[in-house]
Amino acid sequence: MKRGQRLERVVALAAEQENEAARILAQASRQIDEAVAQVEAMRRFRAEYCARLQREGGMNALQLNEYRAFLANLGKAIEEQEANLQRMRQEHAALQRSWRQLHCRHKGVGKIRQKIARQEQGVVEKRVQGELDDRAAARRRRRG
């Protein structure tokens, strides 16, 4: 088996690894988009809740305490989601670096395979040319 043929499996494996990393990266991107939408929805809800309270006017002490507690819990939930979103973005950056490395590896192995294929083709062409030259020389000797 020629070197170029042996490298085919290495190139295929590098392509598989790159594609899998790209799939995982795309999934992480979708999850970030979903998390951003969720945080934005929670912020809108909080703003709407505050606006509704201001429109409705006064409330008794018990209602005010419940309102404050609810807003505090909602604020904590938003902070937790934002922290989770930050972790997701950091993980996404790491996945992106990993994909980039695998992409470069796949590209590099592919270039090596192409170089070896060109070398092997050159050897074949040189051998064929040598055979053609030998045949032509043999014909000249037979004629001469």
Give residue ranges: language-model regions.
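Charge-rich amphipathic alpha-helical interaction elements
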Residues: 1-144
